[in-house]
Amino acid sequence: MNNRKPLQLSLLVASLAVAFTASATNADAHPPLAPLPPVPVPKDNPQSAEKIALGKQLFWDYRLSGDGSMPCVSCHLPALGWGDGGQISRGYPGTKHWRNSQTILNSAYYNKLFWEGSVNSLEEQAPSAAEGAVAGNGDPSVMEMRLRFVPEYVDAFKNVFGSQWPRMNDAYRAIASYQRTVVSDASKVPFDRYANGDKNALDTSQKRGMALFNGKAGCVQCHNGPLASDQKYYDLGLPDFAGFVDDPLYQVTHRWEHYQKGVSEPRYRAANMDYGLYYVTKNPKDVGKFRTPSLREAKYTAPYMHNGVFTSLQEVVDFYDRGGGSGTSKSELLKPLKLAAQEKQDLIAFIEALSMSEPLLHDDPTLPGEYQPLPAPIK
């Protein structure tokens, strides 16, 4: 029996862990970077080809929004890294959003969704987006009725879920199933190929960048494990988004978010910052903290950070090299790195090696036809 390849992989994982441990500023161990495991699937929403196909149609279907203009794909376009390419996500007509549209690439691996971790699963994420006032703004009863007047959907829901009529809870389950297919292909990710034994998958610059990532730059302190995210929350002291001050519609959205998330009266009146994790915990120590985003597919998912303040990986690396931003609650992990220009380029080269060599694209599905009168009263 040939045990050479497992031994090589074990040595690689060990070397990544040692590289960080030797240079870390604390004694905590961090999971090394590694290829993604199989996509986790909840027992109450198993995958099937038919459910995935239905979910893809629903992800693209304009009928799942208030005025029929904001399907899921409008903010998560495959050609734009499964985001929308803007600093701040486009809002529902008549509104403006207040955060960067996160990519849904590899979102199946997160234990919580949204920048402040406000929901626990893709099944919960879908309605939050489709029904959110500044996102899809769809009324679930109206969207459900629309689906019931489309014969193709009636048949598809009956086939997949065994229900007489389409139901929105099932629609969200189908969308979640589809999103679990929007994941990196390890055979096209240079780092994954390297980790799986192809020592030529990374070039010299990328290998130097990997050493920096796990060592001097300390990226692995937060961007670790297969997802390249510890899924924890930090205040980086990021620059503010000027629109919150300059644009009345952003102020409307910001104050509404404060109100519906239940912040204190003084914080509501100020409306001068995005409080992040605080909205979930109401712990003052969590003000300004946001979840560590995955670095997988970062090559294609600019702009970066919860407010889209950085347009390139160069800007991101420069920010961390300075020790992050300012603020009394800024993470103590952030310290000036004093990276040389070549080190920055090597680090960026390695971060890009966590992305596929070409972007993940899905063709638009064929959507069911127009509404048709029902042959019998709905029961």
Curated annotation (Swiss-Prot):
Residues 1-24 form the signal peptide. Heme c 1 binds at residues 72, 75-76. One of its GO terms (molecular function) is metal ion binding. Residues 50-158, 204-355 form the Cytochrome c domain. InterPro entries: Cyt_c-like_dom, Cyt_c-like_dom_sf, Cytochrome_c_Peroxidase/MauG, Di-haem_cyt_c_peroxidsae, MauG/Cytc_peroxidase. Keywords: Heme, Iron, Metal-binding, Oxidoreductase, Periplasm, Repeat, Signal. PANTHER family: BLL6722 PROTEIN, CYTOCHROME C PEROXIDASE-RELATED. It comes from the Bacteria. GO terms for cellular component: periplasmic space. This is Cytochrome-c peroxidase IdrP1. Binds 2 heme c groups. The iodate reductase (Idr) complex is composed of a molybdopterin-dependent iodate reductase (IdrA and IdrB subunits) and two associated peroxidases (IdrP1 and IdrP2). Heme c 2 binds at residues 219, 222-223. SUPFAM superfamilies: Cytochrome c (SSF46626). Its EC number is 1.11.1.5. It is found in: Periplasm. Induction: Abundantly expressed under iodate-respiring conditions. The keyword Oxidoreductase applies. Involved in iodate respiration. Probably reduces the H(2)O(2) produced by IdrA/IdrB to H(2)O, using a reduced cytochrome c as the electron donor. Its cofactor is heme c. The lineage of its organism: Bacteria, Pseudomonadati, Pseudomonadota, Gammaproteobacteria, Pseudomonadales. It catalyses: 2 Fe(II)-[cytochrome c] + H2O2 + 2 H(+) = 2 Fe(III)-[cytochrome c] + 2 H2O.
